[in-house]
Amino acid sequence: MFDQLSLNILDIGMTSLAAGATALRITVIENTKRDWLVIRVRDNGCGMDKKTLRDILAKNTSTKAHRQKPIGLGLALLRQTSEMCGGVFHVHSIPRKGTGVTASMRVSHVDRPPMGDLNATIFALCAASPTVDIELNCESDGEKFHFSSQEGKYHEPRRTQETQGQGAAASCVA
């Protein structure tokens, strides 16, 4: 298990870039009243067939050709975190179309890792592949944040006293 959820997002995002994605959509939704956190990552990379997807989730196999040994723990670790924290994990992939990953979990679960530095995660993904269209959509108890690497701008949510002076995505899941 990664000690921050943003590292799970970074791992999946970097795998998407390695799979040839030209578009990467990341969504984080937190609803503390319903005690629910949802993370979605979708790409238009090479995708996987059902057998490969099953192998990756069951046997810790990697799709990266340069690996000498199969490891591929990224999806397995996020699935473990999601299920351990009372949530659901799902991956949908279509060859030559792309992959979508959804992980949900209880916000209040004692084992839920903190979000971590989501700003640094998005920056790293943009720096790793500046031509890829990377989009981040966050919602935390009704406050919304949107970033698009291709638009070159972001929309910052209305500030509350708690988030005043913090980073741009501060109100998007602590």
Task: Annotate each language-model stretch with its function.
Residues 44, 160-161:
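Small/flexible residues
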Residues 4-8, 14-72, 76-110, 136-141, ...:
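Conserved beta-strand-loop-beta-strand hairpin that lines the nucleotide-binding pocket
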Residues 107-159, 165-174:
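N-terminal assembly/transducer modules of large multi-domain enzymes
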